[in-house]
């Protein structure tokens, strides 16, 4: 589907990542449109959301579209708002009120996040821990290097908090869409690790056993690696996914 817009007709979202973003209303629903820049995030958003659905995870669903913006044609994705009636949206950065301490190893940083979130809001500790590990493990599989505290979202409805669906995968898959085999993946992984800004990384140092349990459950849900091969997503992205799954399960 192709949409046509003029810049002065839409409310752009600024200071929000690398892509051009704005909201539209369609069939009485609100959708976020994310237009590609040079980083070509839309293909990565789509692949990751298709994988998350195959794994049985609660994820934003990205639909591929084309956007003509000021007479220029772009690839883009759109996704329905995940907010329900009565929801209030908070990111972890705002909940904490400050950035977690630097100089912590991965386990120390993870525990710091857990303890300080628990000090700020009323949320079940097991639920909090499991959802953060689920997110971090999925980000590991897709090589998402941009899971910072501002795109980890909690939704409050009444007195209860829940996590938003997974979203924001545009900096995944080693910033590359054209792998034809696995030979170049290790080098790209090393380069990617140096630029990894994620709040939670090195999951092997946090709870490796639990992360492996998650991945095995996800594989069972989607039909194993053969099921991933059947997904309608970029071939290079599939190679990264399968490489990272094997890497994690063999740690």
Language-model features and meaning:
Residues 80-136, 225, 247:
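ATP-dependent phospho-/nucleotidyl transfer catalytic cores
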Residues 1-101:
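Conserved ATP-binding subdomain of kinase catalytic cores across diverse folds
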Residues 56-59, 102-106, 188-193:
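Glycine-rich loops and low-complexity Gly/Arg-rich segments
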Residues 36-40, 53, 155, 159-251:
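C-terminal catalytic region of ATP-dependent kinase domains
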Residues 46, 50-54, 130-138, 246:
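A broad, structural surface signal
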Residues 110-178:
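Conserved kinase catalytic-core segment
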């Amino acid at each position: 589907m192709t949409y046509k817009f003029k810049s002065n007709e839409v409310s752009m979202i600024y200071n929000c990542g690398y892509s051009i973003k704005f909201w539209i209303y369609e069939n009485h629903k609100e959708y976020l449109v994310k237009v590609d820049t040079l980083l070509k995030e839309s293909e990565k958003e789509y692949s990751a959301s298709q994988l998350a659905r195959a794994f049985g995870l609660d994820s934003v669903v990205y639909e591929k579209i084309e956007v003509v913006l000021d007479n220029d044609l772009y690839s883009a994705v759109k996704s329905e708002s995940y907010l329900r009636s009565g929801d209030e949206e908070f990111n972890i950065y705002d909940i904490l009120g400050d950035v977690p301490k630097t100089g912590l190893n991965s386990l120390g940083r993870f525990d710091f996040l857990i303890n300080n979130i628990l000090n700020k809001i009323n949320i079940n500790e097991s639920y909090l821990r499991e959802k953060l590990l689920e997110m971090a493990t999925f980000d590991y599989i897709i090589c998402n290097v941009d899971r910072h505290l501002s795109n980890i979202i909690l939704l409050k409805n009444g007195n209860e908090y829940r996590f938003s669906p997974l979203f924001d995968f545009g900096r995944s898959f080693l910033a590359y869409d054209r792998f034809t085999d696995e030979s170049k993946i290790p080098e790209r992984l090393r380069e990617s690790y140096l630029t990894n800004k994620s709040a939670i990384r090195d999951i092997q140092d946090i709870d490796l056993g639990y992360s492996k349990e998650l991945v095995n459950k996800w594989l069972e849900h989607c039909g194993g690696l053969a099921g991933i091969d059947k997904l309608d997503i970029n071939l290079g992205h599939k190679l990264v996914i399968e490489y990272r799954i094997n890497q994690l399960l063999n740690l």
